[in-house]
Amino acid sequence: MALRTRLGEILRPLNAEYGKVAPGWGTTPIMGVVMLAFLVFLLIILQIYNSSLIIENVDVDWSNGIV
């Protein structure tokens, strides 16, 4: 027998739709756009780190770290 707790009773409605899938594509296009934006963000960070992308007044000298 499962233990019934107050927290479990509060969270039960969130699990009521478990296993049900909305028809069609749903939010898949939104997820794709967000993933693409995150990829662009990571590429920009990588280019800044690799000094491939030069930004004025931004020093990327990693030799003398903050002590």
UniProtKB/Swiss-Prot annotation:
It comes from Trieres chinensis. It is found in: Plastid, Chloroplast thylakoid membrane. GO terms for cellular component: chloroplast thylakoid membrane; photosystem II. It is a single-pass membrane protein. The chain crosses the membrane at residues 29-49. Keywords: Chloroplast, Membrane, Photosynthesis, Photosystem II, Plastid, Thylakoid, Transmembrane, Transmembrane helix. One of the components of the core complex of photosystem II (PSII), required for its stability and/or assembly. PSII is a light-driven water:plastoquinone oxidoreductase that uses light energy to abstract electrons from H(2)O, generating O(2) and a proton gradient subsequently used for ATP formation. It consists of a core antenna complex that captures photons, and an electron transfer chain that converts photonic excitation into a charge separation. The keyword Plastid applies. This is Photosystem II reaction center protein H. Pfam families: PsbH. GO terms for molecular function: phosphate ion binding. PSII is composed of 1 copy each of membrane proteins PsbA, PsbB, PsbC, PsbD, PsbE, PsbF, PsbH, PsbI, PsbJ, PsbK, PsbL, PsbM, PsbT, PsbX, PsbY, PsbZ, Psb30/Ycf12, at least 3 peripheral proteins of the oxygen-evolving complex and a large number of cofactors. It forms dimeric complexes. InterPro entries: PSII_PsbH, PSII_PsbH_sf. Belongs to the PsbH family. The keyword Chloroplast applies. GO terms for biological process: photosynthesis; protein stabilization.
